[in-house]
């Protein structure tokens, strides 16, 4: 990878200590965390407390307690904290957001967002598959499976594109594949602060699907649709 041996660290804790020991003009300025979910909170808090900017892959963490501790660390640090979601950087997503924000659709009334995958249609975690193993393990993934893994993308997309804040949810989570410890399929009914309603679907047992994300938003004067095919 072209990394100097002295900066190839055995752990995130060693990395932070090693970088803090370097002169200010040589040390890392930004730490990007793309570890499994259960290794999000501790390195984020330590990095922020150490003065490093943090870019963290979604989801934020695995519990409300961790989330509050991370929020406190971010507020008390002079460093910046960023939580990333894949699709908000797409040009057409930004255009969709702009169209709605500019009033082209009128007041938002309805939001439909779906994220189907099929890679967990079988008991893949039982086949020594590294990604499947940790993503379906409650100790590493958290309390939810598909909804936490890809439902977070759909939720983020619904709020980002529409400009609405989701304030009420009613969810049904299903575990379809026998032996799986977490949900692999789910649907959510939601309501926003303005009164708009919507439906969110996230599933990883839609055989044949990869990342065919789709969002539709309807307002008083019209609607729009974006699909990742």
Roles of regions detected by a PLM:
Residues 1-4:
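N-terminal Rossmann-like dinucleotide-binding module
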Residues 7-73:
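Beta-loop-alpha module in the N-terminal Rossmann-like domain of NAD(P)-dependent dehydrogenases
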Residues 130, 149, 153-229:
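Contiguous beta-strand/loop segments that form the cofactor/metal-binding neighborhood of enzyme cores
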């Amino acid at each position: 990878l072209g990394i100097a041996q002295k900066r190839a660290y055995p752990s995130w804790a060693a990395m932070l200590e090693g970088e803090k020991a370097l002169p200010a003009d040589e040390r890392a300025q930004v730490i990007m965390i793309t570890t499994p979910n259960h290794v999000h909170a501790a390195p984020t808090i330590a990095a922020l407390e150490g003065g490093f900017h943090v870019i963290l892959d979604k989801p934020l963490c695995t519990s409300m307690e961790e989330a509050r501790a991370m929020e406190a660390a971010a507020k008390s640090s002079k460093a910046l904290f960023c939580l990333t979601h894949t699709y908000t950087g797409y040009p057409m997503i930004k255009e969709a957001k702009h169209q709605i924000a500019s009033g082209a659709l009128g007041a938002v009334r309805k939001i439909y967002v779906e994220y189907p995958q099929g890679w967990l249609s079988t008991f893949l975690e039982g086949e020594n598959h590294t990604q499947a193993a940790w993503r379906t393990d409650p100790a590493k993934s958290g309390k939810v499976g598909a909804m936490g893994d890809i439902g977070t993308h759909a939720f983020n997309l619904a709020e980002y594109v529409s400009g609405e804040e989701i304030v009420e949810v009613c969810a049904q989570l299903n575990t379809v594949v026998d032996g799986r410890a977490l949900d692999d399929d789910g649907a959510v009914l939601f309501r926003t602060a303005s009164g708009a309603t919507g439906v969110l679907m996230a599933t990883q047992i839609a055989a044949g699907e990869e990342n065919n994300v789709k969002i539709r938003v309807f307002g008083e004067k019209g609607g729009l649709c974006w699909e990742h095919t």
